[in-house]
Swiss-Prot record:
The gene is STS. This is Stilbene synthase 6. Substrate binds at residues 55-58, 267, 305-307. PANTHER family: CHALCONE SYNTHASE (PTHR11877:SF14), HYDROXYMETHYLGLUTARYL-COA SYNTHASE (PTHR11877). It is an enzyme of class 2 (transferase). Keywords: Acyltransferase, Cytoplasm, Plant defense, Stress response, Transferase. It comes from the Eukaryota. GO terms for cellular component: cytoplasm. It is found in: Cytoplasm. It catalyses: 4-coumaroyl-CoA + 3 malonyl-CoA + 3 H(+) = trans-resveratrol + 4 CO2 + 4 CoA.
Length: 392
């Protein structure tokens, strides 16, 4: 008879969790930042607020965003005007839209990841789903499992209302699942739509205005597993370690409250400073065991909370400008998609590496870091190891 220790050891994988495929998706409706102030003040019936519109236009100009994809259309706002009003009761209709669209958008990204992976979906043993958009029972994970036709025995983890750091959280969770369940293949999906936070402008809520200028809709998916079969699977990045911490006395720095009016968003002006002043401690704790202290020797996947955060991190760590190129590209093309962002950036990183004929999926470098920042103020740190690129 096997001992408990032998039984437990037999359940564990031998190697590190590895990302095996990536997929991303957005809604069809695209808005351009150059004329978004005109659009936003028109659809929210706020064109009389001329000075606030000028202020909002300046925020948009400084955002470094070219375009975003947003599920809400002008026609939908005409049909449901309370969504576009400032602080009008609207949670019911928001929830009705969200609970249908979040799983659907997640499905689109998941199908792309599954297609790239190339294996039968019956091999998916675990599903980790994350969204800040809406809550229901059974959750978006259950709906997605049914939309994809996953096995009824798939083991599901549903993460609600984690916010922008959760792209790191889902990878940390998937790593634990893959490494502690031999043969596991974990489908990870982040799906975010701004229906939950969209509302009209107010002079008394400038932090809400910042959110209206930054956030976009998108979904991303990865498949994670240990001990990949390289004859049929293509490893992209290894998840070497993962950690989470929160900055003391910063609970209100980034915050959201789900109320009758939807999800309200609150932001302290010193968030870029809080993050940049604490990020090196996270790097040191993560990379000291590997003997790495040169942050420019890493490839970087950082949640693009906004240009001010990226600029502050870049300056504090003396990073070369090219280090955050992939992050800035995703911010420019999609805006801040909350939890979905870092997986978009991973996708951009590996595509850029292959296109540039780099030696590894990490722009030719071996080691990298993935950061998520969000409410708490919480920081997720994931140490990545790239994979040599294979050219046919």
């Amino acid at each position: 008879m096997a001992s408990v220790e032998e039984f437990r050891n037999a359940q564990r994988a031998k190697g590190p969790a590895t990302i095996l495929a990536i997929g991303t998706a957005t809604p069809d409706h695209c808005v351009y930042q150059s004329d978004y102030a005109d659009y936003y003040f028109r659809v929210t019936k706020s064109e009389h607020m001329t000075e606030l519109k000028k202020k909002f236009n300046r925020i948009c100009d400084k955002s470094m965003i070219k375009k975003r994809y947003i599920h809400l259309t002008e026609e939908m706002l005409e049909e449901h005007p309370n969504i576009g009003a400032y602080m009008a009761p609207s949670l019911n209709i928001r929830q009705e839209i969200i609970t249908a669209e979040v799983p659907r958008l997640g499905r689109d990204a998941a199908l792309k990841a599954l297609k790239e992976w190339g294996q039968p979906k019956s091999k998916i043993t675990h599903l980790v789903f994350c969204t800040t958009s809406g809550v229901e029972m059974p959750g978006a994970d259950y709906k997605l499992a049914n939309l994809l036709g996953l096995e009824t025995s798939v083991r599901r983890v549903m993460l609600y209302h984690q916010g922008c750091y959760a792209g790191g959280t889902v990878l940390r969770t998937a790593k634990d699942l893959a490494e502690n369940n031999a043969g596991a293949r974990v489908l990870v999906v982040c799906s975010e739509i701004t229906v939950v936070t969209f509302r009209g402008p107010s002079e008394d809520a400038l932090d809400s205005l910042v959110g209206q200028a930054l956030f976009g809709d998108g979904s991303s998916a990865v498949i994670v597993g240990s001990d990949p079969d390289v004859s049929i699977e293509r490893p992209l990045f290894q998840l070497v370690s993962a950690a989470q911490t929160f900055i003391p006395n910063s609970a209100g720095a980034i915050a959201g409250n789900l109320r009758e009016v939807g999800l309200t968003f609150h932001l302290w002006p010193n968030v870029p400073t809080l993050i940049s002043e604490n990020i090196e401690k996270c790097l040191t704790q993560a990379f000291d065991p590997l003997g790495i202290s040169d942050w420019n020797s890493l490839f970087w996947i950082a949640h693009p909370g906004g240009p001010a955060i990226l600029d502050a991190v870049e300056a504090k760590l003396n990073l070369e400008k090219k280090k955050l190129e992939a992050t800035r590209h995703v911010l420019s093309e999609y805006g801040n998609m909350s939890s979905a962002c870092v997986l978009f950036i991973l996708d951009e990183m590996r595509k850029k590496s292959l296109k540039g004929e780099n030696a590894t999926t990490g722009e030719g470098l071996d080691w990298g870091v993935l950061f998520g920042f969000g409410p708490g103020l919480t920081i997720e740190t994931v140490v990545l190891h790239s994979i040599p690129t294979v050219t046919n």
